[in-house]
């Protein structure tokens, strides 16, 4: 079994390209992770996700602990076997979903108490329990439990939240079962305050996580302010560890973040947009529901190798989406995930060649 490692092969200014080696294979970076919230990427076969070029996908601890339960998934052989995915899986800690989905959520020093949005059952998610759930799932990369600081937040509220995240990170690290090829990432918080972000990094680096995520962004602050934070946070982080920007996936955001030193991304944008009839292309976005595509004999993209582009016209995709045929969202999602993997591949190539890669429309 391979040890967990991160090797940087190329630099271009602050951007890096390399390979993360794990127990479940290699991840080419910069990497985009499709979101498989409940053990499936919506509207996609697992085999189809592989064909898009994805090296890793994301699972959701909160949803999987509720249905079908971490214990059941462990009994059935772990999340990899359960969903027939043999590449790396990163699972989030569940904290963000608890705080955003549960109407009766209470945050204390111990953890987060909440009621299931499914049946109202009461749960307590602690750093230790979140880490245990991810162990049962067999996650390649486990995330430490954090409190996602809302935006806007005052300096004092952000400071209190950041320190709670630090204490939870220490408990998560103590609970993590170290195994060859597996990793745990800590999550940097501090809202938009440089002093707090720097302190968060200093505190979490002491835990010696295998990688570090930047949380609390893409929560309403806007791209300009997000980039302002990313102008300095990566500089505080260890150069030899992967950097993961959580929940960010607009192509222009990815480009800007990679140029500031980020290595990993996840977002529901390509899948959600696909289900709603929006396609990403190198020429810009296409709303396939628009009536102007009803007689369009061209594919979404001529040089895209996904089934939607190699086999069908925009007119056919328009027809499927307008009549709400389930094949429509499937093909649109397949195309979007292929677009995002192609985007990451182009970025990696441009970094290797030492060229600017601001080519997103």
Swiss-Prot record:
Subunit composition and interactions: Homodimer. Within each dimer, one monomer is responsible for RNA recognition and catalysis, while the other monomer binds to the replacement base PreQ1.
Residues that hold Zn(2+) according to the record: 304, 306, 309, 335
Name listed for the protein in its UniProt record: Queuine tRNA-ribosyltransferase
One GO BP: tRNA wobble guanine modification
Binding site for substrate: 92-96, 146, 189, 216
UniProt record similarity statement: Belongs to the queuine tRNA-ribosyltransferase family.
Single GO term (MF): metal ion binding
Coiled-coil region(s): none
Function: Catalyzes the base-exchange of a guanine (G) residue with the queuine precursor 7-aminomethyl-7-deazaguanine (PreQ1) at position 34 (anticodon wobble position) in tRNAs with GU(N) anticodons (tRNA-Asp, -Asn, -His and -Tyr). Catalysis occurs through a double-displacement mechanism. The nucleophile active site attacks the C1' of nucleotide 34 to detach the guanine base from the RNA, forming a covalent enzyme-RNA intermediate. The proton acceptor active site deprotonates the incoming PreQ1, allowing a nucleophilic attack on the C1' of the ribose to form the product.
Catalytic residue positions: 92, 266
Cofactor binding mode and count: Binds 1 zinc ion per subunit.
Pathway: tRNA modification; tRNA-queuosine biosynthesis
NCBIfam families the record matches: Q_tRNA_tgt, tgt_general
Catalyzed chemical reaction(s): 7-aminomethyl-7-carbaguanine + guanosine(34) in tRNA = 7-aminomethyl-7-carbaguanosine(34) in tRNA + guanine
Key words, A-Z: Glycosyltransferase, Metal-binding, Queuosine biosynthesis, Transferase, tRNA processing, Zinc
